């Protein structure tokens, strides 16, 4: 996503399949201390609301048999510590609304507000508007867990999208699946966990001017196709500091991101420029100056995207560790680079399997400072422009990459050849990574 693309994220009145399924699920259950009566009172009065596609918004919403019909009805009642349990069914936007779920109420550090699938259920948020889920204007301490967000790409033809490429107020070709927008007031402490996000003509998970965002164990595919705003599967744009912490604050981990691509030319450049898997972009000069926190991009699988699999662009303090990128650069207008940093500073790129096309350039070093590539694996025939002395050239021996299975066979050249990265304790499937036997790539 490029700087000029911001206006396309929020417009109008309310503007704002996985091929191989892992069993690991992300969890952020808070272990609460109870030091005083005030906190005891807060915990004891936390409410669980229930939502069902067959419910009624005139119900009380506090039992499965008295569930609300819309998620928004429950969201508008939430207080710190509350949980919204969403049951099976399809939840769609009203014709005059810019989102299905607009989250406006915040939790606290010790009492997050959670929106999650009811156990054993698979609710679907379907929309043809600006976003399926939106969080904006300083919202904080929110968790979105286990939902499926589906856009309207299946009902939009490429011919129609081309006819609308200069009509920027059309949500049918510009809608995002999940939008976090902190440009007015910094949004912070948001967890996006275990969701399936797909078929949105704009971005998949789009994060703008936010801090402390965790995107973990999501599956993001078939997004970014029809918008002229330079979207990608997962994008963190204009990162903004909520505090002065210099450690890890943004986490993009354990996600599966594929088949995101741009078919409509980018507005300003009049060319295909984006449609990649994961991008951290333009964080050197946000609204509070350059972002000072670190971003960890780890254990992701990014493949068959139109643009690059993973890129840090005009961003500082990013660690890209133990990812698998494969077969990206599907758009013929773009290079075949799989993983790169450009115009960035203080970026470490370690332990990644970077698998592109024979004879094609797989990485790039574009006017960077203090960017280190090392302990990465490249297949034979790949053109590595920048590397490290501990790099491995060999066959990763994926089990079945054509089916999206990037686990490693026992003879893989990646096994036990990685660098110990203390903050990456498990792999993409939740398997522990032994300190003395770190394997390159998303799988241990």
Question: Can you annotate each of these PLM segments?
Answer:
Residues 93, 151, 156, 199, ...:
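Residues in short coils/turns that link rungs of repeat/solenoid architectures in beta-rich domains
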Residues 94-100, 110, 293-405, 429:
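Predominantly extracellular beta-rich ligand-binding scaffolds that present long acidic/polar faces
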Residues 53-88, 92-93, 412, 429, ...:
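Acidic Gly/Asp/Thr-rich repetitive segments characteristic of extracellular carbohydrate-active
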Residues 103, 151-182, 222-242, 259-287, ...:
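Acidic/polar low-complexity surface segments
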Residues 23, 29-36, 67, 409-444:
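Surface beta-loop-beta hairpin patches that serve as ligand-binding interfaces in beta-rich domains
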């Amino acid at each position: 996503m490029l700087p000029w693309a911001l206006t396309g994220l929020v417009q109008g009145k309310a503007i704002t399949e996985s091929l191989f399924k892992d069993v690991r699920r992300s969890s952020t259950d808070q272990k609460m201390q109870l030091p005083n009566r005030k906190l005891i009172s807060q915990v004891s009065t936390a409410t669980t609301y229930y939502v069902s596609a067959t419910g009624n918004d005139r119900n009380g919403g506090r039992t499965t048999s008295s569930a609300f019909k819309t998620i928004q009805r429950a969201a508008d009642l939430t207080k710190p510590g509350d949980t919204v349990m969403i049951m099976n069914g399809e939840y769609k936007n009203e014709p005059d609304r810019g989102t299905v779920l607009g989250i406006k109420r915040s939790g606290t550090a010790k009492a997050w507000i959670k929106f999650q699938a009811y156990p054993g259920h698979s609710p679907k948020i379907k929309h043809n508007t600006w976003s399926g889920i939106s969080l904006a204007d300083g919202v904080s301490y929110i968790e979105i867990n286990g939902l499926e967000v589906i856009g309207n790409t299946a009902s939009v033809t490429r011919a129609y999208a081309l006819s609308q490429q200069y009509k920027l107020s059309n949500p049918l070709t510009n809608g995002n699946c999940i939008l976090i927008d902190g440009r007015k007031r910094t949004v912070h402490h948001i967890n996006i966990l275990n969701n399936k996000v797909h078929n949105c003509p704009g971005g998949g998970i789009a994060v703008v001017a936010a801090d402390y965002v965790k995107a973990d164990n999501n599956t993001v595919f078939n997004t970014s196709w029809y918008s002229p705003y330079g979207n990608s599967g997962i994008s963190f744009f204009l990162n903004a500091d909520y505090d002065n912490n210099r450690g890890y604050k943004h986490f993009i981990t354990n996600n599966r991101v594929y088949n995101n691509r741009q078919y409509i030319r980018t507005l300003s450049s009049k060319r295909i420029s984006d449609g990649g898997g994961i991008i951290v972009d333009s964080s050197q000069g946000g609204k509070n100056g350059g972002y000072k926190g670190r971003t960890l991009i780890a254990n992701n699988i990014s493949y068959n995207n139109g643009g690059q699999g993973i890129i840090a662009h005009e961003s500082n303090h990013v660690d890209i560790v133990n990812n698998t990128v494969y077969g990206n650069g599907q758009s013929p207008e773009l290079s075949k680079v799989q993983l790169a940093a450009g115009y960035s500073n203080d970026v470490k790129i370690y332990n990644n399997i970077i698998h592109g096309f024979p004879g094609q350039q797989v990485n790039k070093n574009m006017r960077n400072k203090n960017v280190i590539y090392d302990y990465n694996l490249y297949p034979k025939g790949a053109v590595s422009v920048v590397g490290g002395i501990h790099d491995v050239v060999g066959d990763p021996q994926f089990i079945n990459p054509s089916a999206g299975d990037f686990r490693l066979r026992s003879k893989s050249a990646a096994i036990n050849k990685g660098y110990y990265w203390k903050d990456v304790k498990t792999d993409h499937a939740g398997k522990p990574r032994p300190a003395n036997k770190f394997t390159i790539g998303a799988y241990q």
